[in-house]
Amino acid sequence: MTDIINKLQAFADANPQSIAVRHTTDELTYQQLMDESSKLAHRLQGSKKPMILFGHMSPYMIVGMIGAIKAGCGYVPVDTSIPEDRIKMIINKVQPEFVFNTTDESFESLAGEVFTIEDIKTSQDPVIFDSQIKDNDTVYTIFTSGSTGEPKGVQIEYASLVQFTEWMLELNKSGNEQQWLNQAPFSFDLSVMAIYPCLASGGTLNLVDKNMINKPKLLNEMLTATPINIWVSTPSFMEMCLLLPTLNEEQYGSLNEFFFCGEILPHRAAKALVSRFPSATIYNTYGPTEATVAVTSIQITQEILDQYPTLPVGVERPGARLSTTDEGELVIEGQSVSLGYLKNDQKTAEVFNFDDGIRTYHTGDKAKFENGQWFIQGRIDFQIKLNGYRMELEEIETQLRQSEFVKEAIVVPVYKNDKVIHLIGAIVPTTEVTDNAEMTKNIKNDLKSRLPEYMIPRKFEWMEQLPLTSNGKIDRKKIAEVING
């Protein structure tokens, strides 16, 4: 595959009435997707700045993506859940010529001409448009959190997206024209893992409604109505869905492939999924936004579960060469690496290198290569110092999850005068806690055999489930707010 757009057009010509994208009761066929995106592309033609794509889980968000790619300008997805001040920061940074508002609400942009869905539907522009995108053009820019509070716009080139899509289709064992499930909002690059491999293989992209993110029963209704074949989500979202006793192979026999990315896949969750879907293909993948979604993968089997108490993230893919610094920081090199941060030379220079035409990115993740597999060992910036000891919060969390009494865990440092004074563990227990002191004692006894005393949390807070962000990741900030009152 050398071009995603040509691939989509060829499938649309051969199968015009096949459903390309579905969200609740809204659907677009491949013919509609290509026609509407062409009309949008005519309006964007000649623009040298990325289009702001505003909305949530709407089929017309996909129209916006394909239209912006055809026009060659690329897009910046902005989710409706993002705070207004952050939206303003993004628009100020991008200074777009065009904004595509896919919501029913008015959207006043600080810059750029605003189009609506109705504008495109009623447009008399031609439904044929020859794609203008080039391999080295920026296809999308996704804004991630910045340490200074200002979001950073990660620019990904078209050739990187094409290469990633090809790799995903090589991993995919389910074949073409499958029903894919996408959990992630479009401002989160995990969504790329579902969108382009699905459409490039003639599949139907099924979008999880935002109301389902913390309500697995609503997802159950969706899965019952639509026989999903391929599931793409964060591990945390899948763990929440495992609260449904009906989520198993017997109930959903069509569900035969899972892709996870965005955060660590806990061993306990993977074990439960393998048990419930013994015939399914399950992939654990790893990658930062700055390296086009994912750069490693491993198929999780019972053999892998038995061999590794902490799951590896697998081996590198084409376009990504992995290594570590002397301090253990993971470095990614190759075509998968981003073009840098939009209009932020200082931050780009801190973590990217483009010498001799080779792109490298320092991830900030600690990693090791062992037994032919890569392992992620936490974030460098998740290190804290307590009583003179430097430690990794994620190491403590990993050991907590090994306890028979712990289903899920997050460790929160408690500060006083900008100094960490002790640790608290937010715990989802495997059984109901009837005796707080006894449960605390049991968990601490488990930890004492694996961690030094100074790394053991002083106390634990019990939670029914860990809250998730709109991206489907564990919401560490909210947990800290709850614990610190």
From Swiss-Prot:
Keywords: ATP-binding, Cytoplasm, Ligase, Nucleotide-binding. Its EC number is 6.2.1.54. It catalyses: holo-[D-alanyl-carrier protein] + D-alanine + ATP = D-alanyl-[D-alanyl-carrier protein] + AMP + diphosphate. GO terms for cellular component: cytoplasm. D-alanine binds at residues 189, 293, 473. Pathway: Cell wall biogenesis; lipoteichoic acid biosynthesis. The keyword Cytoplasm applies. One of its GO terms (molecular function) is D-alanine [D-alanyl carrier protein] ligase activity. One of its GO terms (biological process) is lipoteichoic acid biosynthetic process. It is found in: Cytoplasm. HAMAP family: DltA. Catalyzes the first step in the D-alanylation of lipoteichoic acid (LTA), the activation of D-alanine and its transfer onto the D-alanyl carrier protein (Dcp) DltC. In an ATP-dependent two-step reaction, forms a high energy D-alanyl-AMP intermediate, followed by transfer of the D-alanyl residue as a thiol ester to the phosphopantheinyl prosthetic group of the Dcp. D-alanylation of LTA plays an important role in modulating the properties of the cell wall in Gram-positive bacteria, influencing the net charge of the cell wall. Belongs to the ATP-dependent AMP-binding enzyme family. DltA subfamily. This is D-alanine--D-alanyl carrier protein ligase. It comes from Staphylococcus aureus (strain MRSA252).
